[in-house]
From Swiss-Prot:
One of its GO terms (biological process) is cytoplasmic translation. One of its GO terms (cellular component) is cytosolic large ribosomal subunit. It comes from Bartonella henselae (strain ATCC 49882 / DSM 28221 / CCUG 30454 / Houston 1). The keyword Transcription does not apply. NCBIfam families: L6_bact. This is Large ribosomal subunit protein uL6.
Length: 177
């Protein structure tokens, strides 16, 4: 029994939800998203709630039950409030700048790294050492933040690199003589 899947999903105020077969659509103030639910899972719209249940008691259906509920809840949160990831840049001379829609990253390489931001995601740089990635699709926002972080992951000795704002870097001690 999925503890997450059992809970009904309430449709937030300001968001309209429709269920067409296995396709769940949500439209809100930030935009419009849809999610195609797996065939193993049954979706029902009842007034201002959406309930998700497995079609049968197979292991495959039960394993996709909770995930489907979470994905539907994420599209509701996305079209209502949106999602945001903050990245911090640590290191001497490491900085970021916007070049039109692209990000120019100076990360200690012999060249600057240019990252092309995909559509559906907005990037702002409040400070040269801070990047804010925001959008309505949680998966896409997280993917863009992970791709930017991958250019220079934080290293454990000095902590230089790009890290998530809430990430804690495990620091190591250097060599001893």
């Amino acid at each position: 029994m999925s503890r997450i899947g059992k809970k009904p999903i309430s449709v937030p105020s300001g968001v309209t939800a429709t269920v067409e077969g296995q396709l769940v659509k949500a439209k809100g103030p930030k935009g419009e998203l849809s999610y195609l639910v797996n065939d193993e899972v049954l979706v029902k719209l009842e007034e201002s709630f959406i309930s998700v249940s497995p079609r049968d008691q197979s292991k495959d259906a039960r394993s996709k039950w909770g995930m489907s509920r979470s994905m539907i809840e994420n599209i509701f949160c996305g079209v209502k409030d949106g999602f945001e990831k903050r990245l911090e840049i640590n290191g001497v001379g490491y900085r970021a700048a916007l070049q039109g829609k692209d990000i120019q990253l100076s990360l200690g390489f012999s060249h600057d790294v240019i990252y092309k931001v995909p559509s559906g995601v907005t990037v702002s740089i409040p400070k040269p050492t801070e990047i804010v990635v925001s959008g309505i699709d949680k998966q896409q926002v997280g993917q863009v933040a992970a791709e930017i972080r991958e250019y220079r992951r934080p290293e454990p000795y000095k902590g230089k690199g790009i890290k998530h704002a809430d990430e804690r870097i495990f620091r190591k001690e250097g060599k001893k003589k």
